[in-house]
Amino acid sequence: MTKKHNGSQRVFGRRGRRDIPLENDAMFAEVMRRKDLCIGLLETIFEGRRIRDIVYEDGLSPEAQKYIAFNPGNKSIRLDVYFEDGDTVYDIEIQKADKGNLPKRTRMYSSMMDANMLDKGLEYEELKDSYVIFICMFDPFEKGLARYTFRSICEEAEGLPLGDGRCIMFLNTKGSIGELGSDMDAFFGYINGGVSSIG
């Protein structure tokens, strides 16, 4: 029997010589450099999904603070944590303050991730599914939900998905307790007030 990863129990709340708030970008990226912690977090976010393995571009660890740029004169992006799971790529971001730009920002991130993964000469069908996930320490849409998930659908035909393989997700750490289960509640609790340790 494969041991279940539990991100909320195995990742957070440990103390050492240097305690740093987990919402710190660099600290979050450092924690996510461990494969078991990445898997644990994904299985906490996607309850019921079994993640057997994840693959990093360097073969060793996720790309923390991944930098993507195409033309010197155009805007570049820096992703907090970027990694792959089979035919899916993930970008996970921590956002402490509401700057009012998340919808357009996620559009930019998703588009540049697509352009970065599709080499010249490859077919569009070779694009991997993608998730851009923002863990927000505020309610980005002020609806009280703990999770907001967006996919492309047709406005004229109800229930008709575009099927482009793109998903944008916002996790609201101030959302309703119990909505996403006890593991996610524990994770949100650590994000809101917990620390992780290095050293």
Enumerate the language-model features and the residues they cover.
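Elongated, amphipathic alpha-helical interaction scaffolds
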Residues: 1-199
